[in-house]
């Protein structure tokens, strides 16, 4: 924490001025109508909510019967990797937890944004249910995944928790900094998890896991981009060096995570490629917050080309039909309006 405080001292004056100016930010100003939905005032934020609403899915849609058969054909190392990945995913979801999202929702003073966060809180329950379903289907009992007992003591998990404490839970953090850090948590933490699961399911096995992974990855991309959208509404923004610091810190933590907690080589993947992919995701996120790329990384995974990445193909540039259930697509008669982060708000 000392190094963190020392870094921020460089920006002490401008951060103090920004803290004072937060009360005048239109998103944060006291609003007596913050619980009254109509008329809609923030159309871009409302559109973001309606798009995630259209993407709604349930745990019951994930069928794991074929996955259970396919799982038995994997190598022991691959089975262990999936068990560890599920254990760490459940742990990571606890880092997101409802408390953090509720705090963001409480600070935001418009019903459009509160609706988005409320929907995310509900979906977090579904993600936990799906991960637990997989543990039950593949391993029968969490006790059969030894890592569950060790998670709390893993240095990499502690580093993620410390990152959240430094940048999000810390009362001294600016609202804009918290948005960037939350986007990093949603977009960078677990980026390699999604890539490794797509790598496995690209082999045309485990269709239930493939569907769940695609849904959750898509949703996380939407939550990440929502932070970018709120950030775009702010009148005053942090120094680009602070944004860069937040994102690159998250990258180093995530690289360490795959070097130590999830040895991807045993799963059949290349560690260097995972690291490059994390950097690629980070570059997109930096651009989403108006920064230049830091790593200039190229996506090493062809199978990830169609996966939404923050800053590369933003959630808000996709039409609602991309996220609707197939049964509802035919009902959409009006094309959605595309939103540009360069618009004046």
Swiss-Prot record:
It is found in: Nucleus. The modification N-acetylmethionine is found at residue 1. Its EC number is 1.17.4.1. Coiled coil: none annotated. Disulfide bonds: none annotated. Keywords: Acetylation, Deoxyribonucleotide synthesis, Isopeptide bond, Nucleus, Oxidoreductase, Phosphoprotein, Ubl conjugation. Its main location: nucleus. The keyword Acetylation applies. The keyword ATP-binding does not apply. GO terms for biological process: deoxyribonucleotide biosynthetic process. It comes from the Eukaryota. There is a cross-link at residue 337 (Glycyl lysine isopeptide (Lys-Gly) (interchain with G-Cter in ubiquitin)). The modification Phosphothreonine is found at residue 334. GO terms for molecular function: protein heterodimerization activity; ribonucleoside-diphosphate reductase activity, thioredoxin disulfide as acceptor. Optimum temperature is 30 degrees Celsius. The active site is at residue 131. One of its GO terms (cellular component) is nucleus. Present with 88884 molecules/cell in log phase SD medium. Lacks 3 iron-binding residues conserved in all other R2 subunits. This is Ribonucleoside-diphosphate reductase small chain 2. It comes from Saccharomyces cerevisiae (strain ATCC 204508 / S288c) (Baker's yeast). The lineage of its organism: Eukaryota, Fungi, Dikarya, Ascomycota, Saccharomycotina. The gene is RNR4.
């Amino acid at each position: 924490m000392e190094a963190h405080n020392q870094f921020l001292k460089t920006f002490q004056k401008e951060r103090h001025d920004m803290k004072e100016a937060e009360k005048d930010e239109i998103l944060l100003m006291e609003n007596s109508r913050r619980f009254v939905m109509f008329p809609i005032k923030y159309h871009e934020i409302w559109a973001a909510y309606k798009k995630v609403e259209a993407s709604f899915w349930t745990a019951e849609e994930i069928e794991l019967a074929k996955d259970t058969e396919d799982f038995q054909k994997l190598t022991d190392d691959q089975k262990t990797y999936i068990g560890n990945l599920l254990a760490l995913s459940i742990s990571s979801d606890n880092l997101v937890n409802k408390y953090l999202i509720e705090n963001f929702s409480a600070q935001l003073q418009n019903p459009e944004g509160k609706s988005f966060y409320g929907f995310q809180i509900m979906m977090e329950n579904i993600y936990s249910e799906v991960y637990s379903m997989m543990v039950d289907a593949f391993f029968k009992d969490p006790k059969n995944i030894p890592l569950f007992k060790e998670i709390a003591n893993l240095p990499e998990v502690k580093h993620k928790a410390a990152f959240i404490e430094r940048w999000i839970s810390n009362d001294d953090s600016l609202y804009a900094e918290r948005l960037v850090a939350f986007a990093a948590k949603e977009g960078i933490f677990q980026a390699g998890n999604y890539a490794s699961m797509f790598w496995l399911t690209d082999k045309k096995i485990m269709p239930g896991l493939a569907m769940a992974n695609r849904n959750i990855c898509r949703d996380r991309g939407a939550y990440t981009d929502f932070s970018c959208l709120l950030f775009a509404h702010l009148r005053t923004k942090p120094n680009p060096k602070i944004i860069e610091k937040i994102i690159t810190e998250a990258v180093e933590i995530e690289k360490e995570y795959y070097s130590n907690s999830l040895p991807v080589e045993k799963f059949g993947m290349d560690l260097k490629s995972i690291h490059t992919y994390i950097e690629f995701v980070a570059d997109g996120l930096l651009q989403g917050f108006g920064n230049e790329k830091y790593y200039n990384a190229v996506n090493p995974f062809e199978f990830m080309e169609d996966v939404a990445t923050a800053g590369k193909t933003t959630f808000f540039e996709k039409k609602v039909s991309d996220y609707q259930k197939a049964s509802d697509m035919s009902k959409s008669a009006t094309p959605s309006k595309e939103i540009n982060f360069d618009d004046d708000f």
